[in-house]
Amino acid sequence: MENSEDVFNDDYEHPENVEYILESVLMPSDGSSEFNLLAEDYNSILLNQCRCNETTCENIETCTHGGQYEFKPQQKELTLKKLENTARPIIECNDLCGCSKNSCLNRLVQYGPRRNLEIFHSTRYRSHGLRTKVHIPSGAFICEYAGELLTVTEAKKRLENNHTLGLMNYVLVLNEYSNEKKQQVTIVDPSRRGNIGRYLNHSCNPNCYIGAVRIDCPIPKLGIFAARDIEAQEELCFHYGGEDQSKNINEGKACLCAAANCTGFMPNTSIE
Ligand SMILES: C[S@@+](CC[C@H](N)C(=O)[O-])C[C@H]1O[C@@H](n2cnc3c(N)ncnc32)[C@H](O)[C@@H]1O
Ligand SMILES: [Zn+2]
Ligand SMILES: [Zn+2]
Ligand SMILES: [Zn+2]
């Protein structure tokens, strides 16, 4: 299995002057109560360990976390089973779980981005993009979208600033719902500090999508997964509109994705 080493592995670098971070970090404190709540969540540990004992944690019937990933021997790696419901949380096993790290089939994002990714100049998008040097199977984990974790107030300020100054926008807002009710919003900005995930462009017909992945913290990681088989040299893209792709279209900047179903506009990043 490609990701079977139980160590975090990420030796990518930025082509420009941005601080490389391996996973999301808190924004600088602004002293607000909103920041304090975010910091409290960031510093909390999820006490939801599974009680499996040396089993594979594959089976949703027996493992309280399992069931989202599957190991297909022909692909030689864990892949995400269900592609339809991206808002569904994915919970990985962690150090508190009863299972063995070596045999657990519910640990993927925690080992870091896949290898053979490459930052390049995308002529289509006239800026940086991310592509793969080798084939990627459907459902495979690409990388986290890691950056500074923002409060809603700080995110609104940064969005306004990006808009006013005509800067590229890296702020990503992930809403999670349960029974159609919004449960949690996670906002990540890799503009100043981030990982390789910041280079994926938007497409109206993307080959990747974002899922919320929890490991040992109530704040999810934004995991980028392959939405289909992806060929070597293909640029990796996801839909910036997130869970509701019909919203916020026809409002943003002109879209350069060139997909047959392109709406002509990039979705605006909005915070409800
Ligand atoms: C998260 S960054 C993606 C990486 C970026 N291209 C770079 O050079 O660092 C998002 C920015 O890339 C550009 N971009 C991404 N997708 C685009 C699209 N479909 N059409 C036009 N510009 C896009 C926009 O400037 C957007 O604000
Ligand atoms: Zn388990
Ligand atoms: Zn496990
Ligand atoms: Zn488009």
Which residues does each PLM region occupy?
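Catalytic cores of histone-lysine modification enzymes
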Residues: 73-77, 85-96, 100, 107-214
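Short beta-strand element of the conserved SAM-dependent methyltransferase core
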Residues: 52, 130-132, 223-225
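C-terminal SET catalytic tail plus cysteine-rich post-SET Zn-binding segment of SAM-dependent SET-domain
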Residues: 2-3, 15, 77, 152-184, ...
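Alpha-helical interaction segments
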Residues: 10, 189, 228-230
